[in-house]
């Protein structure tokens, strides 16, 4: 087998018949498969051992040679080579066809490549291929021109002869008529009889004349056709063609079927055709030029590559290895077989029949019919159903052809190459493990034993509990007591990976240290639930075991859950206390007035602890405590003589003292009630200021405290806790009367239906809000339901309003608000009508969720595909450019406050230029990471906006550079070279997409909470579609005039430079953004609505369209409260604007109208300019993500995405080469991906052992006799982990 590490590129091309024969190990001559009695393959059949190799290892067909010692011998009796049976997965055969056939991909694909090459319409091509018309393949124009006078004279003679014969025949008949009439007259016949004889004779003479005329016309037609005959003319009339062939056969060649095309392609002059097409493009216009461009693409593809157009017509068909189209026996003695075998059998049967007919010398019509059937059989084999009705198997199911094996989710690419099944894995239901540390998970004993079986077996042998591996295996299977001790030892510090499907972002797979637990459920830490989006209502998770030392090191360093506290999308912590933990911490930090022990003072926290244990003080009582070695709260006002580090007394509660013990040393004392937001802010602050280990420890301490005190807080929910406001009935009566008044006005005709609806909606919205207010005031502070909402642990006021206030207005399935409210709440219970109305919205919510989850998954897939080759490839691209971002706004009082969007725009980026204040002083120099501190300093200096590096301005040829990307949000440090930032970006955008789609579900369909604008709008932006009812933008600067007509407004812009006025018709319904006489700039919007991004690109250029798209996408996510950093969206948009459309090709190799990557365009121009030639010109193109993915340079990546057959057809004709720079292509061929530690600069590192490691090696028992030690192989064979800490990566020069 080919080793994937020995090549750097993969080229695809057109296989010629010789190539196919070269791959083949023999010709398949018979349609037989397996002998059903002996169950052995038939000789020369589709499973023949002589061709494809033995079915059993080291055994020939007849049994003469058995065992491995005969390896490589070819049996002289049966002709089978003695080798491994797995060669049946790689050896191919072939079928020699009795007549050539065309490859359906090249003739039937859209556009038809054969059609473009030969300039034939697909309809005409089909007629020729399927024997409905003849095609002229060759005309000897010289000979025809030379002999034309002779032939014309000969024709004249022949016509004259026909003319003479006609005249003679007519004359003879005339004479006979006269004789007959004379005879009748002599006999005295009546006039009637004489008339009949005359009429009959005249009829016969007319027929003679007509017959002769027809022959003459035919001759004229034949001769005309011959005179004007050119190559590629079609002739559907068989008789005419035969006449031509019989008369002028020496002057031309013609034929039907693939044979005719093959002859035509053999004579086809590519260079001359390309030249004439270029001439057409230079001089032509419109449709003609467009077609010439398309044809030139195909012609030049054949010219510039080693492909021969003859490859599109096949003389033999490859037969794929038999193990890839297996045939297995079922229980009942019947066979199940791959569809391909049926398709191959049809081809072989028809081919053999055609051979026999040709040998017999059968009539042409029968042979042609058989050839047509052979062509159809090969079509069905390559792409069943592409032309005509598909070939069906039993039960009318279309058979799966070779194309179907590649296409779609179940095809070879997506099913087997990009998604493989993994051994050393298991799955089980998850339960919570509140006792675990953040980096641990609970693994059921049985599962752990099965996963670590080989390790346990080896250790049993090492410790002499078992003599050999076999007995160790037996011990493990019988679960002997010693096995469990060994298992404990083996799993220590051996991380496992946990994964929950759907894996929407990289935190869906994390590493944990396993702890053995009883039972059969996996236990996971409560704080990682957010990242996995897991709950414990029956979710399952999969466990995978990293085996090699490198895999374990990566799992521990990069994937351990305690190293993944931050979200890669926003850079904020994901491991936040939630639910019970929030309740517990809230309870702990609450101060209750008048509690036991209020006002007492204590000399230390320990003394307060004793008082609490003795029940002298309550947890929430207000007490004073002297604190030493503690940082005071940030808002504490120190006494005049106090210095840092002194003891101080603080009025607080014992609960808060306990809470602060969970926080790291040196963290300011927290003396406030902490709801979920406040707790999140603390975790955020910790993540910014402390190392990850400390943050993880603190989170664990908070988790333990939260659970412990949540239990003791006694927060429970009973039906009595849902307290309705006492004055609800009065409020409702009041609003009921107002609603009645509106209804009466409507009945009298004072209001239109529209007005009535909006009035009622307004009235009832007000009523709902009023009841909600009354309800909130009525809730006691200690009410458990109120505590749950107030602490942020669960629910929100809107849900409480529905429980205790009133349900309010709901919407119908169209999304309109129903003007009758639901006055009841869930505590009272709904009436039947109210219940029915409210099911509308709820059902729509569920249906929406189901539909949009699929849409969101598809969006993620497209995003991943377009951005998968964006990897950080270098430290710095050296660009001077950047984008200007606003970090602060002036408040009403003129003070600068941090912009609320700075979090997702300027934060975590590298400054592109110095931040300079008004005195010219540099506050923060260029190249600094803009963290919270730097942004704070810049704002203090009065600077509103800064220029930051961005992926949009990065000048790296491939991927992006670390400086332009800035800080990796997941680690809080500058991004490493090799980070797959494209995939992170796609996941960061796609993951909340699914969240959005699922969020409608929780509001229970209450009006105004449904986000139909969300996902479809994001898709519309990323696919660069023109929005429906798009708002026009101005193309010039000038003054506005507005003209009204009956149906529309006409906004006219009078340009400043006095050129022609431009009118924009807009609907009367739209809201205008301009008034009469306004001054308007280029690119301003005239009405409210969505703008067409292609217009923005055309009028304002690439930079503006980039910013516009980022802004619009962010608008959708922000409206849902989702925080995604701009840099992720920028990476996708960088990919959408990566290509240019060539306008003039100059002296380059580019074609006008061709789409090509900007990097290729620039390097081609550079090459031409250096040699003094004329460069090409182009304009930037905005491509949607689907189109951009399919237009990628890598054909493997594009083929595995969508439209597999079209991509492969195109790639084969252009002999495209895949340089394997992206992730997908490397996964497909089984190489390490060029990201992370797979990037070449990390693969080329040699790890040398440290002195300590060498010493440790010597002390191992095996080496104590002083045997020689091979340093080079250190840490590889032994499976020992290699410490990489001491190795300085930067000092090694050969990185690239």
Swiss-Prot record:
Q: What is its EC number?
A: 2.7.7.6
Residues reported in the UniProt entry to bind Zn(2+) 2: 877, 954, 961, 964
HAMAP family, sorted: RNApol_bact_RpoC (MF_01322)
Binding of Zn(2+) 1: at which residues?
60, 62, 75, 78
Q: Known SUPFAM superfamilies for this protein? A: beta and beta-prime subunits of DNA dependent RNA-polymerase (SSF64484)
Q: What does this protein do?
A: DNA-dependent RNA polymerase catalyzes the transcription of DNA into RNA using the four ribonucleoside triphosphates as substrates.
Q: Which GO terms describe its cellular component?
A: DNA-directed RNA polymerase complex
Name of the featured protein: DNA-directed RNA polymerase subunit beta'
Cofactor(s) annotated in UniProt: Mg(2+); Zn(2+)
Q: Which reaction does it catalyse?
A: RNA(n) + a ribonucleoside 5'-triphosphate = RNA(n+1) + diphosphate
Q: Which residues form the signal peptide?
A: none
Q: Which organism is it from?
A: Frankia alni (strain DSM 45986 / CECT 9034 / ACN14a)
For this UniProt record, the keywords arranged alphabetically read as follows:
DNA-directed RNA polymerase, Magnesium, Metal-binding, Nucleotidyltransferase, Transcription, Transferase, Zinc
Binding residue positions for Mg(2+): 535, 537, 539
State the free-text cofactor note: Binds 1 Mg(2+) ion per subunit.
Q: Which domain of life is it from?
A: Bacteria
Known Pfam families for this protein? RNA_pol_Rpb1_1, RNA_pol_Rpb1_2, RNA_pol_Rpb1_3, RNA_pol_Rpb1_4, RNA_pol_Rpb1_5
Q: For this entry, list what GO says about its biological process.
A: DNA-templated transcription
Return the broad EC class: transferase
Describe, as the record does, how this protein assembles with itself and its partners.
The RNAP catalytic core consists of 2 alpha, 1 beta, 1 beta' and 1 omega subunit. When a sigma factor is associated with the core the holoenzyme is formed, which can initiate transcription.
Any one Gene Ontology molecular-function term assigned to this protein's record: DNA-directed RNA polymerase activity
Q: Which family does it belong to?
A: Belongs to the RNA polymerase beta' chain family.
Q: Which gene encodes it?
A: rpoC
